């Protein structure tokens, strides 16, 4: 039987083209997985969010709504926990059936998305490192009560309480203090403060009157806006904004 060499050559060439195309497609798929859209800072926010949500499991979405106190709080409670507190499960920084040693695994599994009152940068970096090693690498949100300065963290600047700030009627001073507060928060690993408190202080029996700007609606509004301007610094593009 005589073999048509031209026919065989064409078959071989076609096979070679298909093989190369397959390799290119596999390489393209691999690149897409290693650099997903939600990690691309050049894309718009909505596109990145949509891509991330499409990849998240329901457990990971729930995890983003879970917040624990910082590990140092947990360790302190574990060390000094009384029998009475253990019975009532009401100790500060205590969670039944959760030990501080389990926190890294909770982060890596996507079971927690936020921490409260992380009081030093070493702890913040420790927690974020475990978040980097999670399946999707979603950073943790770290919040703190920076009501009048980042005062819960040792060595930071403490400003007068908001009620005293309001007595100055100086919104520029309040804004500048808030800028400095945001800077010190970011330097210690926090991104979120539970301030300002813009409730109206109408009942002196309330325990958080000192965290407000008083009872006057106009003054509270002006001071609240000034504090927000200082903390957010516009569009959050500043590395020191919170």
Where are these regions (language model features)?
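Bacterial N-terminal signal peptides that target proteins for export
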Residues: 2-12
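Bacterial N-terminal signal peptides
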Residues: 11-21
């Amino acid at each position: 039987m005589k073999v048509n060499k031209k026919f065989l050559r064409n078959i071989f060439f076609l096979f070679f083209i298909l093989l190369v195309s397959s390799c290119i497609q596999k390489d393209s798929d691999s690149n897409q997985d290693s650099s997903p859209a939600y990690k691309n800072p050049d894309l718009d926010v909505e596109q990145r969010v949509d891509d991330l949500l499409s990849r998240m499991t329901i457990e990971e979405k729930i995890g983003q709504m879970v917040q624990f106190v910082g590990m140092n709080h947990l360790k302190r409670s574990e060390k000094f926990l009384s029998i009475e507190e253990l019975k009532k499960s009401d100790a500060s920084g205590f969670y039944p059936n959760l030990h501080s040693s389990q926190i890294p695994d909770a982060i890596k599994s996507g079971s927690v998305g936020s921490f409260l009152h992380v009081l030093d940068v070493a702890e913040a970096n420790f927690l974020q490192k475990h978040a980097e090693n999670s399946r999707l690498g979603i950073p943790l949100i770290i919040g703190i009560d920076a009501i009048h300065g980042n005062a819960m963290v040792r060595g930071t600047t403490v400003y007068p309480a908001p009620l005293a700030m309001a007595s100055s009627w100086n919104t520029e001073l309040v804004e500048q203090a808030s800028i400095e507060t945001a800077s010190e928060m970011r330097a210690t690993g926090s991104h979120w403060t539970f301030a300002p408190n813009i409730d109206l202080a109408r009942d002196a029996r309330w325990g958080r009157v000192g965290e407000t700007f008083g009872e006057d609606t106009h003054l509270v509004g002006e001071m609240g806006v000034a504090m927000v301007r200082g903390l957010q610094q516009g569009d959050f593009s500043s590395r020191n904004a919170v």
